[in-house]
Amino acid sequence: MTTLRLLISDSYDPWFNLAVEECIFRQMPATQRVLFLWRNADTVVIGRAQNPWKECNTRRMEEDNVRLARRSSGGGAVFHDLGNTCFTFMAGKPEYDKTISTAIVLNALNALGVTAEASGRNDLVVKTPEGDRKVSGSAYRETKDRGFHHGTLLLNADLSRLANYLNPDKKKLQAKGIASVRGRVANLVELLPGITHEHICDAITEAFFSHYGERVEAEIISPDKTPDLPNFAETFARQSSWEWNFGQAPAFTHLLDERFIWGGVELHFDVEKGHITRTQVFTDSLNPAPLEALAGRLQGCLYRADMLQQECDALLVDFPEQEKELRELSAWIARAVR
């Protein structure tokens, strides 16, 4: 009986793919070696301990329908589109060894005609006249009895979009999250014109089989049919939830300030697990009462634009004379936290 398992996703949904990865990892036998191949449509994927408001231009992501997905491994933020090929290697301990999976990817690239090498803890680079350029980044996760190594290969990614979503707005954030390290990157298509996702997947699969001396039929994972994986529905619900993708951010402080015709406003938010734990308001408005009331209402509120706007709008009942000012305030806060 083979000890290998090969899964290929035909979904471009990052929440679906990460839920599949999580379910396989949890339920795989300790003796199994798994290769999972997948890719995501426009998505920013952040590390387990990162703060999306710090790492990402969340406002532009919303405008461009770019999803946010938090993975269960550490590391930094990356932008995925269909020009990325994603891979995950899993194994039980003591079999799990990320140097083996790294070697498999390097062997796959070599078979395609690309000479790459490992650089630092997480990257694969190619030599060019301009210097080393990164073609792959990885992250890792280990539990007591198993581990996985997942990463991306830049195939034909739209590199111009990296800066659109990974360079955050100049927000006044003081956060404990891990800042992403930006590096010089290259697409494999620059080195191998005409290379496709299927070529990469075939090469990694062959290198995987060659290393272990076994072969196995691929299992195609599709969103058209719920995967036969234990607790998949619950895992997908969690992976796609605001509470996981945003609410798991490390504690941080966000300072907003704006000058309106009716006065200047400074808001200091302390946020933990996606909820506001404290709001301080400073203003030179002649009528600070609505703002003072807002500070009280926001205690415990989800740090989400629609929820903050809802609390601002609720003040209209108690302060109808300040409707114009409150609507301006509401719109500004919603824009600022997106």
UniProtKB/Swiss-Prot annotation:
Job of this protein: Catalyzes both the ATP-dependent activation of exogenously supplied lipoate to lipoyl-AMP and the transfer of the activated lipoyl onto the lipoyl domains of lipoate-dependent enzymes.
NCBIfam families registered for this protein in UniProt: lipoyltrans (TIGR00545)
UniProt subunit comment: Monomer.
CDD domains membership: LplA
Pathway named in the protein's UniProt entry: Protein modification; protein lipoylation via exogenous pathway; protein N(6)-(lipoyl)lysine from lipoate: step 1/2; Protein modification; protein lipoylation via exogenous pathway; protein N(6)-(lipoyl)lysine from lipoate: step 2/2
Biological processes, Gene Ontology terms: protein modification process
Single GO MF descriptor: lipoate-protein ligase activity
InterPro entries according to UniProt: aa-tRNA-synth_II/BPL/LPL, BPL_LPL_catalytic, Lipoate_ligase_A, Lipoate_protein_ligase_C, LipoylTrfase_LipoateP_Ligase
Gene Ontology CC annotation, any one: cytosol
A matching Pfam family: Lip_prot_lig_C
Other information: In the transfer reaction, the free carboxyl group of lipoic acid is attached via an amide linkage to the epsilon-amino group of a specific lysine residue of lipoyl domains of lipoate-dependent enzymes.
Residues bound to (R)-lipoate: 134
UniProt KW Cytoplasm keyword: yes
Residue positions binding ATP: 71, 76-79, 134
EC number, as in UniProt: 6.3.1.20
Keywords: ATP-binding, Cytoplasm, Ligase, Nucleotide-binding
Organismal lineage: Bacteria, Pseudomonadati, Pseudomonadota, Gammaproteobacteria, Enterobacterales
Keyword Glycosyltransferase: no
Domain of life: Bacteria
UniProt-recorded name of the protein: Lipoate-protein ligase A
Span of domain BPL/LPL catalytic: 29-216
Catalytic activity: L-lysyl-[lipoyl-carrier protein] + (R)-lipoate + ATP = N(6)-[(R)-lipoyl]-L-lysyl-[lipoyl-carrier protein] + AMP + diphosphate + H(+)
Family designation: Belongs to the LplA family.
Cellular localisation: Cytoplasm
Gene3D superfamilies per record: Bira Bifunctional Protein, Domain 2, CO dehydrogenase flavoprotein, C-terminal domain
